[in-house]
Amino acid sequence: PSFAPDGSRIVFNSDRGGAPQLYVMNSDGSNQQRVSFGQGRYTTPVWSPRGDLIAYTRIAGDFRVGTMRPDGSGERLLTDSWQAEAPSWAPNGRVIQFFRTAKGSGKTSIWQVDLTGANERKLPTPVDGSDPAWGPVFP
């Protein structure tokens, strides 16, 4: 689960309807609403720093990172390759990092993509990397 930046809502995934899908509810647990309706399973939801988008992993034969608005509209897949998962927002809300598992080898690496789905690139790390997370930004 992930809290909206203002703390008023929570996004989470649940398999209550069969395959895991995304739901948004008020922080007190009321007003639970399903917001994902695509094919496959939806996991690892996380609110953007501005609260205007939710990033997630969609699993439908492959793993892809996407975004949607909190009401479920505007769904957009940002990656189109083998096993991209576990999105993490940059503090400015313009870039998403994720990890990818290489087909065949099982090696993992950190990647990032901007919100247009362009400018996808592998980030250099000395060893395999997974589950990226951003630290606080200090002036």
What are these language model-derived features?
Residues 1-139:
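Sequence signature of WD/YWTD-type beta-propeller architectures
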